[in-house]
Design a protein with these regions (language model features):
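Short polybasic/polar patches that bind polyanions
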Residues: 31, 53, 187, 299-300
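Membrane-interface amphipathic/re-entrant loop segments adjacent to transmembrane helices
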Residues: 128-144, 148, 152-208, 215
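Conserved beta-strand hairpin/beta-sheet module of binuclear metal-dependent hydrolase folds
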Residues: 34, 155-158, 250-305
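Metallo-beta-lactamase
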Residues: 306-317
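Feature representing long, continuous alpha-helical segments
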Residues: 96, 100, 111, 115, ...
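Hydrophobic alpha-helical transmembrane segments in multi-pass membrane proteins
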Residues: 1-139, 196-251
């Protein structure tokens, strides 16, 4: 619409007007979302692009991402402690790696498959570090959830903020409920989620190197062995994250771990062949420290079963988990 007006275009080029309007919308969205890390990342990336356009300069995609990373860390240093920080920037970095600078044009479906492949494979180390889980059906979930939420739910919800359009909010709710129903159905599939221990640091670093090697330029049409030579070697570097267990007590050693269970107690005692849990921590209304703290710790350490559990007394801060 801006381009159709000679008066407006002469005073402010349409490209500058578009990026300025986009920046305002991104800022409003970030405010509404509580400045969540993905919203901050998008806002700062768009701000870098806007500055480059207004100054008549080109800005590389990696430079835009680097500046966004810098501003997020500068303004919110504690953001690096959140899994969303690493997953958000990691996903965008992977998308850039698999799409930016590639020679030749490909079909949109091929491009989408490449992006899904990169994200699914590339986020494995982070998912294992933070959650000790890998959603095996995430490509299918993303294929359904991302378009519906991005193109339907979010626009309808933002439009409903305007009082005259609040009547469309139930429609957004229905679409979101439909998406959640599908996601719950996918999560009920057997082996929908791979669960394991937290890999040692060296295996994480090896996996990252292996994944980057596998994502080097190649051809989907020509198979995994096409393109950059020996990309299959990346699989070798990835495998240790699944096989190598964390450090375990040696014979004759006793390891005691006091878990941060709030106003309560949960202690894990381990030897080379046995694991005992002393107290389970408190309960938290609909949830408890057992599912939130104790079980993730045991899973992360590669402990599949307890040899014994001792509850010192029946107070909820010791037995609520």
């Amino acid at each position: 619409l801006w381009r159709r007006s000679a008066y407006l275009t002469l005073r402010l080029p349409a490209r500058r007007a578009a990026v300025a309007a986009g920046l305002v919308v991104a800022l409003a969205y970030a405010v509404l979302s509580g400045f969540a890390i993905p919203a901050q990342r998008t806002l700062y990336m768009l701000a870098v692009v806007a500055i480059a356009i207004w100054r008549g300069r080109q800005s590389a995609a990696t430079t835009v991402l680097a500046w966004a990373l810098f501003w997020v860390v500068l303004l919110d240093p504690w953001a690096v402690m959140a899994p969303g920080f690493w997953l958000s920037f990691g996903a965008i970095g992977l998308i850039m790696l698999i799409t930016v600078g590639r020679i030749g044009r490909v079909h949109w479906l091929t491009d989408w498959l490449r992006v899904q492949w990169a994200i699914t494979l590339g986020l494995i180390p982070l998912l294992l570090v933070f959650f000790q889980q890998i959603p095996m059906l995430s490509p299918f979930a993303n294929a359904i959830a991302i378009p519906l939420i991005s193109l339907v739910v979010v626009p309808l919800t933002l439009l409903a903020v305007i009082p005259l359009f609040d009547f469309i909010l139930p429609l957004a709710h229905e679409v979101l409920s439909f998406v959640m129903t599908i996601l719950h159905a996918l999560s009920d599939f057997p082996q929908a989620v791979w669960q394991q221990h937290t890999p040692p640091l060296w295996t994480i670093l090896a996996a990252i190197c292996g994944i980057l090697w596998m994502l080097l330029p190649g051809s989907l049409a020509g198979g995994f062995f096409a393109g950059f030579p020996a990309r299959w070697l990346g699989v070798v570097a990835l495998l240790p994250v699944f096989w190598v267990l964390p450090a375990q007590p040696k014979s004759g050693e006793l390891w005691l771990t006091i878990l941060d269970a709030g106003q309560g107690l949960a202690v894990v005692a381990r030897t080379a062949h046995h694991t005992v849990l002393f107290d389970t921590g408190p309960g938290f209304g609909d949830t408890d420290s057992g599912s939130r703290i104790v079980v993730p710790f045991l899973r992360g350490e590669g402990i599949r079963k307890l040899d014994a559990m001792v509850v010192s007394h029946a107070d909820t801060d010791h037995s609520g988990g």
